[in-house]
Amino acid sequence: MSSLRTQSTGGGVLGLSSVGSDRTGATSTAAGSHSHSHRRHHHHHRSRSAPRAPEKPPRKRHLNPGHSIASIPSQIKLSMLNSGLISFATEELGSSMSTTLPTAPTELSQFPKLCELRRKFPVLYRVEFQTATKVETHSCRHAMKPANKEKNQNQRCIPYDYNRVVLDPIEGEPDSDYVNASYVDSILKPNAYIVTQGPMENTVTEFWRMVWQEKACCIVMLTKTFDFIKVMCVQYWPASKEKDEEYGGIGVSVLKEEELANFHIRTIKLYKKNENDEITEERTLLQFHYTEWHSHTCPFGNAVLEFRRRVRAVVGSTIKNESGPMVVHCNDGGGRSGVYLAIDANMELAEEEDAFDVFGYLKKLRQSRRGLIENLEQYKFVYDTLEEFVVCGTSWFPVSELSQRLKQKSIKNPTKMNEYQREYQQICKQTPRFTIGDCAGGHRADNREKNRDVLVVPPDNFRPYLTSFQGNSYTDYINAVFVDGYTKPREYIVTEWPLRHTCGEFWSLVYDYECAAVVVLCVPPPGSTNFPSFWPEGKHSKKYGPVFTIDHISHNHYTNIKTWIFRINKKIVSLTELMAGVKAPPKTVQLFQLTCWPMGHKVPTSTNSLVELMNMVERWRQRTDYGPVAVVSPDGRSRCGVYCAANACIEQVIQHGEVDIFQAVKTVRRHRPQLVENMTEYKYCYDLVLHYVLHYLNKDMNEKK
């Protein structure tokens, strides 16, 4: 670290050796050289008899206590740290920074202010993180044994000797007591968790031995088995319900699996048998597998909070739980595991004492295992997620309370805002903002003309990339974004009505992503040149772009709804694909058009027709392997969000008997902030779900039975 020093000058300016020292030194040298040259030139013309003025001794630079770091007001000090004028180091700042570090748990009512201060001065995150992670290290002798090294994913995340999980040894097998796992305390309970690495081919047996021995209450898995062309963790449970697996004398079978957009929940049975192949003991536990948390990234906070809610709904509080610890793992038992523990333990503290202790718990985590919360971004994510929990609170409620809740939400409080307005205002505050750089693909010169509105452009991370080759003048771009549903990620693809020169791209989207259905939520004026027809209206075929030909198969017209079934034919024009003999099989899609939502209207004229259309789409998808749904509106922003959010809520009602429109709307706005763009659309989402519950729910539930 560069040292910090003060210069006692007339103005009392703070001098910093770490700021511009090279440049200052170079300037001083140049100036000194110039001055010396000038003096020699001046002496040459001076009278020999003129007495030479004595040179003043250089002014001593010394540390003035009045100008020390400690004397600088906190706000100025933070600004200097934040702008890089001074660098953070414990030995430099000493006790002067102690006031910025939390010394006790923060009350929930004060936590948003704490987060706001850190957003204003992001350096505070770094100060906390660097301070908390400078903890005393402990011996890892067992993990470093030659026989055990091959049982570790890497040498960065290994257990300390003092709190490692010790397996019951197997007779005749030295070091069979080792597994890369550590006991970790929560804030309120010792040994509440076991943090371990994702099992490898040679450690699956040790993993299940540990789960059985410790009587684990559940398994929380925070990684995909395969991510970014790398095996992160082997699949340590049976691939199908029909086949059991055995690991070290422990039988493992999957009884049930439930899929949601961001995670899966598996019910797993463990059992042991005797010599006669009879089951002598069996247990059931749940595995909660978060599937949308990629390595080196942070997921969406509301999705992690929902995941944690599902875990705790089954497991209960760790304080009251009499069963064994919760087993938590990511790929190496490091960063992601630490993030989950920090969120879970702090929320449990909030439930008991209305407080969070993020900084204090990070110190405890790092004393328990190396690498828990491994970088600054993950530490910020913990803060952001806990703040979201405080600000948003609990927004779900049982479907049985829906009518009563909607009446309460309409009542205005003293601020003249009702609950709908407060919720929508909060959603707008938390909607992500994307920069032009985030949406670079849509702003490229060759793609700019493919957007109806240059302000509504998809982020590159969340847009579908077209893969069908249509010629050298075509790119992989279409103005569309993925939107998560309730049970599936990227369940919807939201897009705008195609322009005349983008109809080929639209059908490429439907073909490349195997969309089961296309939902069109408007009827343009007849003969409109701004909204060209992009499907064959009659019983004939039509070509769109150089590659796609759409064949009419059948059509039906109902009250306020029209449907067509089309066959999409693709012509191979890529020389590489032709030489490789690539085939492009035709694909079938059904297009649904809602005809009761006129242009210029904020909501349709018939709520029942829109709900009926949703049901028709769902029935069609059940027959076609649940491909994504392409949702089309005039501008790709209005109407689509209502359809996606209401659909997700209806699925939540069916699956779990719950309603959470607030979180559903937050979810659809993650990738396109303009979705559900006003209060009218937000309120209409509630109306759609209420209509479904009152008129369709019982009938649909009976059909599923």
What do the predicted segments below correspond to?
Residues 1-705:
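Cys-based phosphatases of the PTP/DUSP/CDC25 superfamily and their flanking regulatory architecture
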